[in-house]
């Protein structure tokens, strides 16, 4: 009997269950590391078909999750992240197709050189091994993480939030169907089959050495816990306090379009703008139109004293507002002294995630892009492009804001490490 079936009938303790899942994933990782690209792509193609064929079941399961979340009084932003629609399910399938079409990173020789003694040294991409993904409300993370780990030759253990449990299970069923059609082990993509929160602690401990890296996708408290307690490396961002700076040289219509999209396209995503910075030199031309547009679009604006004067609907900003990830239709706004003032504000209040400048002045843009210490910096584009799909990665497993190994959207290539292959002809070291 498999570990997952033991969990369902309640005959195994959680520690035993999780340890077994880790061992099975480790065994699957050894198989995936050697799987040819064609076999992995066959699995991905079958997963894409299964997601489309199983859309009704996925949506029905999600509807139950959403009903429970509404009954529990969750926020509108949370419900948006939890809710699947036919379009979002189709986007999952399309994302799988894109991942299938990207180059397989495993085995790629990134560098090669020959030493004076005749040895050839190659640096080659290899899988990380077993990736644990701990996430909260977004059920589509199950699909994104599963297919990216498969493409990069990694086994993955998925631990979704209890609120999205049914949705994740329905999606996982489709992924496993694809694995089976391609002759790959079920344990290549494992879903923790329990809502028990103690499972998270066991994952953070590494499952007796089975887990190589952890990726948390969720709120500040989850990510902070993972970074504090994990005994294995973590790819994570704590929060997305993202800024849009509108320079004095900015085209007003472009600025309005970018600011509105950055804040209001989807307020609950980590790439949403949370603070609007406007060049003091553009206050008379740009401030009122931007603030009025946001408020008229249903966004609450919290501003400094100057911003409050342009529209009576602006609420006073507190010190905490400059450090807040709202994930809702709320934005903080203030004037700054040019690009230097914007950079200084972001340095003091940013989260190293995503920040944008709207400017026609290429020197101001270059200064911003060069000096803002964030994983993603944009010139004349919305912060909502902070997404692996928009980078051409097909999907992302998360956005890393640290400075080791992976930074920015974590796609298939970022889920590999490297080893050195050395070819000799009998050389010995003197």
UniProtKB/Swiss-Prot annotation:
UniProt keyword annotations, A-Z: Amino-acid biosynthesis, Cytoplasm, NADP, Oxidoreductase, Proline biosynthesis
Matching Pfam families: Aldedh
Enzyme Commission designation: 1.2.1.41
UniProt xrefs under PROSITE patterns: PROA (PS01223)
Chief place of localization: cytoplasm
One GO molecular-function entry: glutamate-5-semialdehyde dehydrogenase activity
Reaction(s) the record says it catalyses: L-glutamate 5-semialdehyde + phosphate + NADP(+) = L-glutamyl 5-phosphate + NADPH + H(+)
InterPro entries: Ald_DH/histidinol_DH (IPR016161), Ald_DH_C (IPR016163), Ald_DH_N (IPR016162), Aldehyde_DH_dom (IPR015590), G-glutamylP_reductase_CS (IPR020593), Glu-5-SA_DH (IPR012134), GPR_dom (IPR000965)
Location(s), subcellular: Cytoplasm
Family the UniProt entry places it in: Belongs to the gamma-glutamyl phosphate reductase family.
Protein name: Gamma-glutamyl phosphate reductase
Protein's organism: Rhodopseudomonas palustris (strain TIE-1)
Name of encoding gene: proA
């Amino acid at each position: 009997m498999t570990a997952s079936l033991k969990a369902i009938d309640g005959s195994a303790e959680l520690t035993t269950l999780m340890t077994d899942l880790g061992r099975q994933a480790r065994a699957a990782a050894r198989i995936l590391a050697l799987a040819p690209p064609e076999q992995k792509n066959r699995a991905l193609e079958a997963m894409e078909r299964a997601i489309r064929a199983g859309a009704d079941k996925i949506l029905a399961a999600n509807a139950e999750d959403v009903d429970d979340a509404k009954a529990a009084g969750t926020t509108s932003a949370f419900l948006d992240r939890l809710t699947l629609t036919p379009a979002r399910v189709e986007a999952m399938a399309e994302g799988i197709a894109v991942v299938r079409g990207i180059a397989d990173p495993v085995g790629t020789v990134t560098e090669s050189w020959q030493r004076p003694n005749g040895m050839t040294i190659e640096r080659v991409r290899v899988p990380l091994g077993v990736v644990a993904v701990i996430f909260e409300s977004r059920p589509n993370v199950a699909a994104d993480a599963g297919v990216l780990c498969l493409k990069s030759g990694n086994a993955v253990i998925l631990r979704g939030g209890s609120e999205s449990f049914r949705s994740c299970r329905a999606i996982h069923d489709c992924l496993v169907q694809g694995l089976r059609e391609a002759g790959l082990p079920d344990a290549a993509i494992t879903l923790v089959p329990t809502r028990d929160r103690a499972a998270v602690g066991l994952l953070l401990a590494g499952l007796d050495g089975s887990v190589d890296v952890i990726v948390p996708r969720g709120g500040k408290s989850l990510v902070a816990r993972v970074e504090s307690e994990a005994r294995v490396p973590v790819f994570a961002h704590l929060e997305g306090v993202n800024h849009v700076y509108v320079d004095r040289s900015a085209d007003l219509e472009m600025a309005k379009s970018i600011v509105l999209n950055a804040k209001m396209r989807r307020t609950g995503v980590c790439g949403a703008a949370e603070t609007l910075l406007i060049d003091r030199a553009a206050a008379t031309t740009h401030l009122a139109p931007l603030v009025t547009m946001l408020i008229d679009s249903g966004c609450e604006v919290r501003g400094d004293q100057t911003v409050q004067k342009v529209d009576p609907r602006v609420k006073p900003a507190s010190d905490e507002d400059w450090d807040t990830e709202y994930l809702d239709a709320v934005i903080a706004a203030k004037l700054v002294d040019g690009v230097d003032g914007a950079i200084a504000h972001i340095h003091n209040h940013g989260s190293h995630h995503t920040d944008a400048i709207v400017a026609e002045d290429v020197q101001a843009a270059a200064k911003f892009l060069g000096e803002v210490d964030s994983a993603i910096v944009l010139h004349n584009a919305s912060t909502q492009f902070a997404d692996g799909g928009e980078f051409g990665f097909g999907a992302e497993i998360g956005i890393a804001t640290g400075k080791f190994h992976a930074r920015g959207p974590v796609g298939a290539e970022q889920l590999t490490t490297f080893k050195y292959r050395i070819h000799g002809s009998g050389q010995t070291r003197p």
